Amino acid sequence: MGYYDIDDVLADGTEFPCKFQYDIPGLGYLENNPGRPITKNTKLSLPLWLARILAIVGGDEALVDEEPVPFVELLPPDMFSTKVMNAIKTDPVALDLHSINSHFFSLAIKWIMLFSEKELANVVSELLLQRAQELNHHASSLSIDLNADSTGKNSANTNIATSTFLLKLEEMEKEIYKKSHESYKDTKRWMFKK
């Protein structure tokens, strides 16, 4: 991940629910009220790159002893809800992460870093481990000829199962699958040349 990584840019553009903790004049256009203020306790969805800054930067510094209250409070998004976490714990491999969010792992890492959520970190680590094993299985089951299975015989079922599995992957997993598959193909080519 980095400044020029398009997936990181797209992940940072994902909108997260926020609650404003101040009345802010002139920002009414964010809720389709140009020229009006945003009032305290207004809930809006903001892109993560903006919400993260506003959630860290404090507003009014009334007392020296107190920490300044940030402009917004980041609210937990639906992708980290109890319902989704239970689905992950139940069957991490069968879960369609792409339908939850196409940059699930990137956003989970960013959320964990922001809030030091150990429980979420444990769930996401286990999810990645389980899905990585399945990714490896699918990447290794394809031979050099995409119309043949690992025994060299044509197998439409292998390709259909892999295609269905690939549709459920989020972007980081797709990249891992691609690299793993290319590595297996290169290894098989090398072994056949010997």
Swiss-Prot record:
It comes from the Eukaryota. Its main location: nucleus. One of its GO terms (cellular component) is nuclear replication fork. Pfam families: PSF3_N, Sld5. GO terms for biological process: DNA-templated DNA replication; double-strand break repair via break-induced replication; mitotic DNA replication initiation. SUPFAM superfamilies: GINS helical bundle-like, PriA/YqbF domain. Functions as part of the GINS complex which plays an essential role in the initiation of DNA replication by binding to DNA replication origins and facilitating the assembly of the DNA replication machinery. Belongs to the GINS3/PSF3 family. This is DNA replication complex GINS protein PSF3. It comes from Saccharomyces cerevisiae (strain ATCC 204508 / S288c) (Baker's yeast).
